[in-house]
Amino acid sequence: MRILVSNDDGILAQGIRTLANTLHRAGHTVTVVCPDRERSATGHALTMHKPLRAEAVENLFEPGLAAWAINGTPSDSVKLGLDALLGERPDLVVSGINCGANLGSDVLYSGTVSAAMEGTIEGLPSIAVSLASRVRCDFQPAADFLVRFVRALEVQPLPEAFLLNVNVPALPESEILGARVCRLGMRRYRDQFVKRVDPRGVNYYWLAGEVIESEEAPDSDVVAVGEGCIAITPLKYDLTYEPGIGLLGARQWEKIFDPLAGG
């Protein structure tokens, strides 16, 4: 299988090296195209006002594995890889392994998820994979699971291209209690901007904060990971709120555009 691998933690991150090398050893043709530095929480941003540069990377991954570092975002990396760098169209796009969970509303900010979503936009099945810890970062169990997961998708391909958001609990493989297909949870944060002053007396701010503990639906990704299971959540780029179509459609919006209407 031809697989394009990207991430948002950058080319030097251990997560992408573990993922790409493990897929390569499993017999897949792997090409890495990812940011040249940390680009977490950049969402689906694209670089529009400066040129993108791609630098071939050697001696970082296993022999026979092609890799490129891009001076852009995760979405830039996948888009440039598909349109300019890869000789053949891949069968699959995989983004990760992220250091830290991407659960619930995290997916709206996540560069990891956005890199995979770019593959979906281009009509390719895509997977975003994250390790649900920023402290205990043994990526190998997540990489081994992904190899088995990709093998299962080869045997029984998805009927259409969509994104699978995979979150793996930071546990030894023997302690992971299976995998669940689930929906997005809430995952809200209590944000805090820490104000500081630089040597010139100018204020600057760091974004900090913590997760707000709240009741989650039992079929959510947040609950699955919290109970020691791998969470697999299908996602699509269509963000339409379907009930809103009916709610808004029942109103007489044409009056807004009628200059003869009262008001």
From Swiss-Prot:
Disulfide cysteine pairs (residue numbers): none
Details of cofactor binding: Binds 1 divalent metal cation per subunit.
Pfam families: SurE (PF01975)
Molecular function terms, GO-annotated: 3'-nucleotidase activity; 5'-nucleotidase activity; exopolyphosphatase activity; metal ion binding; nucleotide binding
Documented EC number(s): 3.1.3.5
Domain of life: Bacteria
Keyword field: Cytoplasm, Hydrolase, Metal-binding, Nucleotide-binding
Cofactor requirement: a divalent metal cation
Recorded catalytic activity of this chain's protein: a ribonucleoside 5'-phosphate + H2O = a ribonucleoside + phosphate
Annotated localization: Cytoplasm
GO cellular component: cytoplasm
Residues that hold a divalent metal cation according to the record: 8-9, 40, 98
InterPro entries named in the record: SurE, SurE-like_Pase/nucleotidase, SurE-like_sf
Family: Belongs to the SurE nucleotidase family.
Function: Nucleotidase that shows phosphatase activity on nucleoside 5'-monophosphates.
Alphabetized PANTHER family for the sequence: 5'-NUCLEOTIDASE SURE, 5'_3'-NUCLEOTIDASE SURE
Protein name: 5'-nucleotidase SurE
Gene name of this polypeptide: surE
